[in-house]
Amino acid sequence: MPTIQQLIRSERSKLKKKTKSPALKQCPQRRGVCTRVYTTTPKKPNSALRKVARVRLTSGFEVTAYIPGIGHNLQEHSVVLIRGGRVKDLPGVRYHIIRGTLDAQGVKDRKQGRSKYGTKRPKKA
């Protein structure tokens, strides 16, 4: 417990909040190039083949990013835009690829929640 005199001399240091997405370097999104596109399995108790990509970012980092939605057209050397946001059942995946921008096409035949998957509004028949 510091004395009042010690507190006058030097104030209490503020606790620094650690960022959950350091590779973005305080930016909302970052551009990057896919170095590897593959599937991985989630933690227990879930079971699936989740689509992920290793992305080399313009900030110099190489991160693992999740590819949301059903089906994708990404391959090695695809240019993608990533945002923060982890995938709870995939350890080490702290970023999402934004669908419908750069080389990542939107999800085909999506009717609901289209804005999250980069899908245009369907034409009225």
Curated annotation (Swiss-Prot):
This is Small ribosomal subunit protein uS12. The gene is rpsL. Part of the 30S ribosomal subunit. Contacts proteins S8 and S17. May interact with IF1 in the 30S initiation complex. CDD domains: Ribosomal_S12 (cd03368). Keywords: Methylation, Ribonucleoprotein, Ribosomal protein, RNA-binding, rRNA-binding, tRNA-binding. Belongs to the universal ribosomal protein uS12 family. InterPro entries: NA-bd_OB-fold (IPR012340), Ribosomal_uS12 (IPR006032), Ribosomal_uS12_bac (IPR005679). One of its GO terms (biological process) is translation. The lineage of its organism: Bacteria, Bacillati, Cyanobacteriota, Cyanophyceae, Oscillatoriophycideae. The modification 3-methylthioaspartic acid is found at residue 89. Residues 9-28, 104-125 are annotated as: Disordered. Transmembrane segments: none annotated. PROSITE patterns: RIBOSOMAL_S12. Pfam families: Ribosom_S12_S23 (PF00164). With S4 and S5 plays an important role in translational accuracy. One of its GO terms (molecular function) is structural constituent of ribosome. One of its GO terms (cellular component) is small ribosomal subunit. Residues 113-125 have a biased composition (Basic residues).
